[in-house]
Amino acid sequence: MDDIYKAAVEQLTEEQKNEFKAAFDIFVLGAEDGCISTKELGKVMRMLGQNPTPEELQEMIDEVDEDGSGTVDFDQFLVMMVRCMKDDSKGKTEEELSDLFRMFDKNADGYIDLEELKIMLQATGETITEDDIEELMKDGNKNNDGRIDYDEFLQFMKGVE
């Protein structure tokens, strides 16, 4: 598994991991190897509020199912959920945006600094340059203090819609 994805998975809250584990376990019941089939994966992700297209789902599966077993273990599933969570914020409630802010704010200091932003953006799997990351920070950091607070984050995310 790519280190960038591992870093992003580490930023998930225990609550998020527990929610993902509960959904995963529903589909793994009766499976001796503790894995779910790739066919069941779309159902699990939809149950968790994600709605990947069949193409996106296949792309994610291809990335994590390196041995071609047709199954995904929980660690691989977490990586897929992190990738899927990168979707834009259209229609997101303030509660969902608050959860997203906390996911970015790895050290829980109430701010997103450049390094936290970089880790999360790289975890999306998209090609992104240092200049792109710095530009996003500049766009989100309205008071020019070098970090994005919650209000700036909300304002920025509302502008993305």
Curated annotation (Swiss-Prot):
Positions of the EF-hand domain: 16-51, 52-87, 92-127, 128-161
Binding site for Ca(2+) 3: N143, D145, R147, E152
Residue ranges of coiled coil: none
GO MF, one example: calcium ion binding
Function: Troponin is the central regulatory protein of striated muscle contraction. Tn consists of three components: Tn-I which is the inhibitor of actomyosin ATPase, Tn-T which contains the binding site for tropomyosin and Tn-C. The binding of calcium to Tn-C abolishes the inhibitory action of Tn on actin filaments.
Miscellaneous: Cardiac muscle Tn-C can bind 3 calcium ions per molecule. Domain I does not bind calcium.
Family as reported in the entry's similarity comment: Belongs to the troponin C family.
Protein name: Troponin C, slow skeletal and cardiac muscles
The species this protein was found in: Coturnix japonica
Underlying gene: TNNC1
